[in-house]
Amino acid sequence: MQILQQTTIGANTTGASNTAFGKSSLKANTTAAGNTAFGFKALCDNTTGSLNVAVGFSAMRLNTTGANNIGIGKEALECNTTGYENNMFGNEAGDDITTGFQNTAVGSNALG
């Protein structure tokens, strides 16, 4: 089926308890655990960042080691790399944050 070729479910290498659904979601994951990624390129670059939730097209796409973050919405928290304990809700919410911590934003382009 065509859709199966573009969907990964639970894809990672040595990580544990991760859930991924969408092309390239959690693509680079190595040892990170407890992540949930739903959407095209959600948490795509994540390697060791754990306990993150990314839902939406490119949500938290550039995250590598950031942990305990939530990004819900298209490109929410997209540029975060090492930031932690951030909560972003809305399209492009917090998409300019790269290393911030303990930020919360609600709404389209909030903190973006």
Segments from the language model and where they lie:
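Glycine- and small/polar-enriched repetitive beta-structure motifs of secreted/surface proteins
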Residues: 1-112
